[in-house]
């Protein structure tokens, strides 16, 4: 019996082997070879675009094919992102597909289809990290020299290091969304394509950090990065040590070994962080929300390769995520967004006057008019005929008038939030699109200018819960969006449009006590920015409509208020003449704008904590490039426009006063919150860095106030000692606490770190930290 069972098992195994061989042979006989790589070295984040690098080789006959990536979505259908390609005989094509990653994206496949026949298939597995994770990318000849980045511990989330090549870098900015910082060292960047450079530039503007190294091979490293360099490098120079770098992080290491650095002249807008023997060693340049760093030495060579201080350099420069205002996080409040998308005349109830008049005429005709006509005709017995006829007639009229009220043309309610940055010619757009249909049908939604479409969380517009998005030369096309009679289906979109064009001469003047913002702002575009507002950390200034070529004067706004208060959203809405809870007299446009503003600025306690200077307003003339394929539409366009301004800095005083309103922060609390009503076990950390480039030569004093109703003995506050690299407990006062030996607790870049601790069993409402730093630039 055992021998018999063994023979059966052997026979089954042979059949399986033969079938597997046949499958491989069938795939080979198609002449199609498909390879695919998901993410950045396999790394990705949820609710962000996932780049899939695809290579297709055709060794057979000419082929018209569709290459697509697909996965099973939360609704039980298939989400498919594809592109139609021509594959001539003996051809090879390489390109990126972009898949919107959700919590359901775990296993997906990349396939090549000819008609409905699958010619090749690759199965891929991904495990996308949460959005608060930190992803470092390294493009280097020796990636292992930067493995120390794995040891950096951000305040929240995990750290992941991706080893990349030039070819791995996506050609669209959306594909860079998961990446927080990129290190480029000793590789030929001249291989970067124009599309990759544009994507890199937009990624930096949207908050990415680029770290470029120098050293002996600086020419290779900078070959394709001329437009990104804070320094115009011209030659190398020998230095007899890097003591200034150790002093920058208050490290006791000598770093007295000689090394070679790549020297040059500063570009406009660049500032020196570290200078060695008169040569800029570490330089930074702000671009939008992000930063570019140039490090003139080579960290992969001695003495830096043996120096532990490089970890702190990376931690200080790269671990602190680029701060962005809440509207730039591409996240909308879903309730307010739905309200804004449904705010159109066709979905509003008919006027009460219209309804009353209609009912009045109906009652009058069916009753008195019908009676007097039949009486005059002396044919009262016909009432049993005329009444039903009149009822049917009025019912038909009601149906026709209702159909006319809904209209006969589909409507696209396009809500766009545009974010521009000074010095960048493109503005990022996050859009919500509501597709309204007067009848039950399906549409193909298409975009221009390389806009990408993605499903919203509560999207029910998919035909059979399937999502089919096809990439083309101009943008994307979303197939079979089903809309019910008088219904609205919502879709998300991302892309870029030309920036508005704003010129200014704003100056931040540092005085002994006050830091003032003043100057002029000019609209150099052909569009009117309506209800413009200048937003600063402490207040907002209504500017009214900013017409083409119009100029507004800004007169001495104080930026360093001693007790800064968050920007009040309801106050901005009131300034714009909008209401959080619309009144019956509000127009449909006012309701739509109010809801969209609240969707774009979701906030806790009705307030926004901001740093930086922004110009905001409404645009009527620039729509998001989204329409319906082969279908005329009636568009409703609402664009909320923001531009981050970069005022110049005038350091007039020998001593300056910096307050918390001039700082970005990063918190270990969930959601990067600054306040807490329940201190977690072990406490939490808040890390502050200046939002305006400032470098301190000396610190005179540091004072802070903890906004809390709890007694000082209930809370423990510690400050990070940059010299001993430890947390030091600070004795709290009831009101203002003066910090002893303040220079130890302030980094050379003005950074300050607080740690708040207390019993997790007590109710301790820490609402914020206000501090005042007196220093010498």
What are these regions (language model features)?
Residues 48, 105-188, 216, 220, ...:
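Aromatic-Pro/Gly-enriched surface loop or interdomain linker
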Residues 176-223, 286-295:
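Short alpha-beta junction capping motif
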Residues 1-10:
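Bacterial N-terminal signal peptides that target proteins for export
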Residues 27-75, 81-98, 102-104, 108, ...:
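Extracellular ligand-binding/catalytic regions of CAZymes and related secreted enzymes
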Residues 209-284, 290-295:
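An acidic, glycine-rich "communication" segment
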Residues 9-19:
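Bacterial N-terminal signal peptides
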Residues 433-587:
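Soluble catalytic regions of membrane-associated enzymes that act on cell-envelope
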């Amino acid at each position: 019996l055992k021998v018999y069972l063994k023979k059966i098992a052997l026979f089954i195994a042979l059949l399986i082997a033969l079938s597997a061989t046949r499958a491989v042979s069938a795939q080979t006989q198609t002449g199609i070879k498909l390879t695919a790589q998901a993410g950045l070295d396999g790394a990705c984040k949820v609710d962000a675009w996932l780049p899939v690098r695809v290579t297709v080789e055709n060794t057979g006959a000419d082929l018209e094919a569709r290459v697509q990536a697909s996965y099973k979505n939360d609704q039980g259908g298939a989400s498919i992102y594809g592109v139609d390609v021509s594959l001539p005989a003996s051809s090879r094509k390489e390109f990126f597909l972009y898949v919107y990653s959700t919590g359901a994206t775990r296993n997906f496949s990349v396939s090549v289809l000819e008609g409905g026949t699958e010619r090749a298939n690759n199965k891929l597995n991904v495990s996308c990290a949460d959005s608060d994770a930190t992803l470092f990318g390294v493009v280097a000849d020796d990636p292992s020299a930067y493995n120390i980045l794995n040891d950096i511990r951000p305040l929240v989330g995990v750290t992941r290091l991706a080893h990349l090549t030039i070819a791995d870098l996506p050609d669209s900015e959306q594909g860079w969304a998961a990446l927080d910082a990129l290190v480029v060292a000793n590789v030929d960047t001249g291989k970067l394509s124009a599309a990759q450079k544009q994507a890199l530039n937009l990624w930096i503007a949207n908050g990415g950090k680029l770290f470029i190294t120098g050293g002996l091979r600086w020419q290779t490293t900078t070959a394709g990065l001329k437009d990104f360099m804070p320094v115009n490098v011209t030659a190398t120079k020998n230095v007899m040590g890097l003591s200034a770098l150790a002093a920058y992080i208050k490290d006791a290491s000598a770093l007295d070994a000689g090394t070679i650095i790549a020297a040059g002249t500063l570009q406009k807008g660049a500032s020196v962080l570290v200078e060695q023997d008169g040569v800029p060693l570490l330089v930074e340049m702000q671009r939008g929300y992000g930063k570019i760093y140039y490090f003139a030495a080579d960290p992969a060579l001695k003495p830096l390769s043996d120096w532990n201080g490089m970890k702190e350099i990376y931690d200080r420069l790269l671990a602190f995520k680029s701060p962005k205002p809440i509207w730039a996080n591409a996240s909308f409040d879903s309730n307010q967004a739905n309200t804004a998308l449904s705010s159109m005349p066709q979905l509003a109830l008919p006027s009460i006057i219209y309804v009353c008049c209609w009912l009045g005429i109906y009652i009058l005709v069916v009753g008195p008019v019908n009676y007097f006509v039949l009486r005059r005709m002396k044919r009262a017995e016909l009432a049993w005929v005329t009444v039903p006829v009149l009822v049917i007639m009025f019912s038909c009229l009601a149906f026709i008038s209702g159909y006319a009220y809904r209209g006969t043309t589909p409507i696209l309610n396009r809500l766009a939030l545009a974010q521009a940055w000074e010095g960048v010619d493109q503005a990022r757009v996050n859009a919500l699109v509501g597709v309204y249909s007067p009848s039950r049908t399906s549409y193909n939604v298409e975009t221009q200018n390389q806009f990408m479409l993605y499903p919203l969380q509560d999207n029910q517009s998919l035909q059979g819960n399937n999502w089919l998005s096809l990439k083309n030369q101009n943008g994307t096309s979303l197939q079979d969006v089903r809309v019910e009679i008088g219904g609205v289906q919502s879709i998300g979109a991302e892309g870029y449009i030309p920036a508005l064009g704003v010129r200014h001469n704003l100056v931040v003047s540092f005085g002994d006590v006050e830091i003032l913002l003043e100057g002029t702002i000019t609209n150099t575009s052909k569009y009117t920015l309506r209800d413009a507002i200048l937003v600063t950390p402490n207040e907002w200034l209504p500017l009214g409509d900013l017409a083409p070529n119009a100029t507004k004067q800004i007169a001495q706004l104080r930026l360093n208020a001693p007790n800064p208060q968050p920007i009040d959203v309801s106050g901005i809405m009131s300034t714009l003449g909008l209401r959080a809870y619309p009144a019956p007299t509000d127009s449909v446009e006012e309701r739509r704008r109010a809801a969209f503003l609240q969707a774009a600025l979701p906030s806790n306690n009705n307030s926004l904590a901001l740093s930086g200077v922004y110009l905001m307003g409404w645009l009527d003339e620039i729509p998001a490039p989204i329409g319906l394929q082969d279908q005329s539409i009636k568009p409703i366009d609402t664009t909320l426009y923001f531009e981050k301004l970069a005022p110049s800095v005038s350091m007039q005083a020998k001593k300056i006063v910096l307050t918390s309103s001039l700082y970005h922060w990063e918190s270990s609390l969930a959601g990067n919150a600054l306040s807490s009503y329940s201190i977690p076990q072990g406490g939490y950390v808040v890390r502050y860095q200046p939002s305006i480039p400032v470098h301190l030569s000396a610190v005179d004093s540091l004072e802070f106030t903890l906004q809390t109703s709890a007694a000082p003995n209930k809370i423990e506050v510690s400050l990070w000692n940059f010299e001993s690299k430890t947390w030091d407990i600070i004795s709290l006062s009831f009101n203002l606490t003066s910090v002893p030996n303040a220079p130890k607790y302030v980094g050379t870049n003005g950074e300050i770190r607080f740690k708040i601790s207390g019993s997790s069993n007590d109710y301790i409402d820490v609402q914020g930290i206000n501090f005042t730093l007196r220093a010498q630039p």
